[in-house]
Amino acid sequence: MNVEIIGQKFEQATRLLCEYMPLAETLIKPTLFHCIRVGVYLYHHNYSLDLIIAGIMHDALEDTDISEGLLEKEFGLNVLRIVKANSVDETITDFWENKRELISRCIKNGEDSMIVKACDIFDSFNYYSKLKSQKDLDFCIGISKIIFNKLPENFSDEIFKTLKNKLSEYS
């Protein structure tokens, strides 16, 4: 993929996210910063344009007023599919059951959806370790364990090894 096109789409996604992102104090973490870091990680590790954009937009349906229709119009059905797989089902009220269902949905959607989720959790691990927030690190540990309990053997992308190594630092 042409670097110029990636740059244009990256900026388009970032601008859209900025336009719809609520004020930082209404969110549990600096979500915009997190979403950009996930996209940058995917870019620096030579993932496809759709994965880079899905990484930037992975929290858009949960944390902004961006609609599925707008996401599809701007970035296509594949990006929407990955973002939807990475979005919590608000009808499931049990916290950990919600996370197990989300991971199962990502797996069912395919390795690309799990790559974005693994990158999301890897970034959260790094962020919360810098904050020394044990509660948030415990969340990262818990969801990583769910990932590795469910991850199919044929999902072999490097991000899974990277996340497993990060998990081993805390287990």
Give the role of each language-model region.
Residues 1-171:
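Active-site helical microenvironments for divalent-metal-assisted chemistry
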